[in-house]
């Protein structure tokens, strides 16, 4: 998604807030080179990265090793399809799951979410991140690609918050929080000075769960639970 260091810092903060306390078990579905997994391991989580690419998993292992023994010992790589997590790791075996940048890249989104639900223990937490179709449409339109914007407005591979909530419900996952990442932040913001960076981070944190800002964010971050009915949440969250 073109997320820079600052964007990752914002996302990581939201993920840590959503997850149960360490040393909970977490599966990172489609975790690739392990940027998020290793960061979570650094906070004490026991993370299993599932990815189809052996090369990606090798990079993940090296990234973990570079962080030292304790972190490396908390990261495990498993080569396989994220749509088959219960078979790979065991039904209900994980306290939490993270799945970022994968949902809109698979052919069968329902199968992926069913897999994530199946690997979670009852009440387990899912942190789900994906490119926001509304943001993509706005970006295309502002760049003068009105035909591209129209295609996105009418549908396409990317999805919206409401569409994601329906998919989650079908998988037996209740949406409990939704936030935006990258409302104002851009990849080039990594070069901001310390004061500007702190101001931007605080701005992003304050608007992440508020409309209309959330719906115009680059990335949507959804938190769901297995087997838990959605509560009535404050208006600034859902």
Indicate residue ranges for each PLM-predicted region.
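Conserved alpha-helix/loop element of class I SAM-dependent methyltransferases that forms part
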Residues: 5-22
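Conserved class I S-adenosyl-L-methionine
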Residues: 23-32, 127-151
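Class I SAM-dependent methyltransferase SAM/SAH-binding core
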Residues: 35, 39-85
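A conserved beta-strand element that flanks and buttresses the S-adenosyl-L-methionine
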Residues: 98
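A short glycine-rich, Lys/Arg-flanked "PGG" loop and its adjoining helix->strand segment in the class I
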Residues: 110-125
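Short alpha-helix
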Residues: 155-172, 178
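Conserved Class I S-adenosyl-L-methionine
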Residues: 177-238
């Amino acid at each position: 998604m073109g997320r820079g260091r600052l964007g990752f810092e914002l996302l990581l903060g939201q993920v840590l807030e959503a997850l149960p306390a360490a040393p909970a078990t977490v599966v990172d579905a489609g975790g690739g080179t392990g940027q998020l997994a290793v960061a979570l391991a650094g906070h004490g989580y026991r993370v299993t990265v599932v990815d189809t690419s052996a090369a990606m998993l090798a990079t993940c292992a090296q990234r973990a090793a570079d962080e030292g023994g304790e972190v490396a010992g908390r990261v495990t790589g498993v080569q396989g399809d994220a749509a088959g997590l219960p078979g790979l790791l065991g039904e209900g075996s994980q306290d939490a799951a993270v799945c970022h940048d994968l949902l809109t890249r698979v052919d069968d989104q329902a199968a992926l979410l069913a897999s994530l639900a199946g690997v979670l223990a009852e009440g387990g937490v899912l942190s789900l991140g994906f490119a926001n179709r509304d943001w993509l449409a706005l970006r295309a339109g502002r760049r003068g690609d009105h035909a591209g914007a129209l295609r996105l407005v009418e549908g396409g591979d990317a999805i919206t918050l409401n569409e994601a909530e329906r998919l989650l419900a079908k998988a037996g996952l209740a949406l409990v929080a939704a936030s935006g990442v990258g409302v104002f932040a851009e990849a080039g913001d990594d070069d901001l000075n310390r004061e500007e960076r702190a101001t931007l981070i605080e701005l992003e944190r304050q608007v992440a769960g508020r409309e209309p800002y959330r719906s115009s964010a680059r990335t949507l971050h959804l938190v769901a639970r297995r087997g838990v009915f959605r509560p009535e949440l404050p208006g600034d969250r859902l």
